[in-house]
């Protein structure tokens, strides 16, 4: 068992350095997350802890160890030793249950034009065809699908909103490429560019029962385990988001609202929403590079009924181009670069 970074063998009462195990009782590895990288050009490399990183129970001073020490060093009858052990394990299990409750998390990622290679009868995708202007081949498509899935897996949150996918076939390919056990929701919108939303979620954490979509927006409502009933509103337009928030508040006052995507047209304080990424924006961070500065194209707003734990831009070195100054775009104008996309994801933890 680990206490303050040291393994303690409760059988022989020996201390072992990190990374070692006793062989009789202790079988564990110490997980140590690597230091967060920092991207050049003004965007802080901000990461987040995965769900398992919050499961870090500290056993220092726990009665469990006192019971074992007392039992080994005194002439206590075996029955009392057994009772003491059982009590210790019960206290240990109760402590772990309390400490293991992770905060809830939501993320949003603009995949930056993830088209398939088949002509669409609904939208104008002629540029993104093998014979089109972008020379969008099957190999390039598969590479971007794998990169998008890697971003979702790296975020590792129960709710990950995705924008910029052409159809459900693309979403299905991304879900199949994900290593995490994600389910997905998809609805076709009436956008002129043929790009839609999808929601990737953990089926044991979120239980959706209502999905709606319209012109540059999509909502998914349901029970978020441990948080009650919530609704995630995703937006790809600053123009309509304020109206959609007010409409939702009128029609579903019992639902706690999460907003992700383009939110510049919203009035968060008037609508009972907090801005977890406000500090990051003031610090000059953003999701997309525009000339010599960063723009917060994607954002997250959280219902004030929740307490924000942390929110920021999600930046990793492999999401940046070789210069480290901007996100690694798939295309620069018409030149193929081979990156995941020109946008960085955003995320927020809340309780």
Predicted regions and their residues:
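Metal-dependent phosphoester-hydrolase catalytic domains
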Residues: 247-258, 264-351
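Compositionally biased, low-complexity flexible segments
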Residues: 23, 27-50
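Bacterial Sec-dependent N-terminal signal peptides
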Residues: 12, 53, 66-102
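Structured beta-strand-rich core segments of catalytic domains in phosphoester-bond hydrolases
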Residues: 165-228, 235
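Active-site beta-strand/loop signature of hydrolases that rely on acidic residues for catalysis
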Residues: 106-111, 147-171, 232-236, 241-270, ...
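N-terminal, active-site-proximal structural segment of metallo-dependent hydrolase catalytic domains
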Residues: 67, 98-177, 189
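Intrinsic-disorder-associated, low-complexity terminal segments enriched in Asp/Asn/His/Tyr and depleted
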Residues: 1, 12-15, 24, 29, ...
């Amino acid at each position: 068992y680990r206490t303050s970074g040291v393994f303690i063998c409760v059988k022989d009462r020996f201390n072992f350095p990190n990374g070692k195990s006793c062989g009789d009782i202790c079988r564990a590895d110490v997980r140590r997350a690597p230091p967060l990288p920092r991207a050049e050009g003004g965007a802080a490399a901000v990461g987040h802890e995965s769900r398992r990183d919050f499961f870090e129970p500290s056993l220092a001073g726990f009665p469990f160890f006192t019971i074992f020490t007392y039992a080994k060093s005194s002439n206590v009858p075996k029955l009392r030793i057994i009772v003491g052990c059982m009590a210790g394990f019960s206290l240990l299990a109760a402590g772990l249950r309390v400490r293991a409750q992770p905060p809830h998390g939501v993320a949003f990622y603009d995949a930056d034009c993830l088209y398939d290679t088949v002509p669409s009868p609904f939208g104008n995708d002629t540029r993104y065809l093998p014979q089109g202007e972008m020379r969008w081949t099957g190999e390039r498509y598969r590479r971007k699908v794998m990169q998008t899935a890697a971003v979702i897996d790296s975020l590792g949150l129960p709710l990950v909103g995705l924008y910029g996918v052409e159809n459900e076939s693309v979403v299905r390919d991304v879900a199949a490429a994900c290593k995490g056990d994600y389910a997905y929701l998809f609805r076709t919108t009436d956008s002129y560019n043929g790009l839609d939303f999808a929601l990737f979620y953990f089926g044991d954490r979120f239980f959706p029962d209502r999905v709606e979509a319209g012109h540059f927006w999509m909502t998914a409502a349901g029970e978020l385990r441990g948080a009650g009933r919530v609704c995630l509103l995703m937006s790809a337009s600053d123009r309509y988001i304020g109206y959609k928030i007010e409409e939702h508040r009128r029609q579903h006052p019992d639902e706690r609202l999460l907003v992700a995507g383009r939110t510049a047209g919203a009035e968060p304080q008037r609508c009972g929403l907090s801005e977890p990424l406000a500090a990051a924006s003031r610090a000059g961070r953003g999701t997309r590079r525009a000339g010599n500065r960063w723009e917060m194209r994607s954002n997250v707003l959280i219902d004030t009924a929740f307490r924000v734990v942390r929110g920021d831009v999600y930046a990793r070195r492999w999401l940046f181009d070789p210069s480290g100054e901007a996100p690694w775009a798939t295309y620069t104008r018409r030149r193929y670069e081979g990156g995941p996309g020109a946008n960085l994801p955003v995320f927020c933890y809340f309780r």
